[in-house]
């Protein structure tokens, strides 16, 4: 299973922003104003793991189709009147999350609400490819900045309520 930061988890920026807001901060540090992320909840991540356990034949990567959001929109959803402080991107930090690389596209298939990257190995047999999927285009690239599905500030605010973060 491959997915980005789970919304509200320790690896997510949400707890960091929440702490700043709870401390009375009105200026939110943003490493890069163009930064985007995928939105996946803990429940969605668990469901994907269970699906992978049930459907996998061995070696596949399951990737959930998630909406994207701008980190600046997340800050606005949590603190509507906030100001941004551009603090610069840190070493190793990614501007956008990448779930399927162009190299992965050679063996990636799209299903209704997820993708599967099948092993590109000699021992893998095509009969193991799950029915109902469509081979993605060559050089397909699935990242948080080129995703067709985006959350608005209001949709982020509603999604935050679903993970018990209310402002």
Q: How does the language model describe each region?
A:
Residues 1-167:
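Strand-loop microenvironment adjacent to phosphate/nucleotide-handling motifs in alpha/beta enzyme folds
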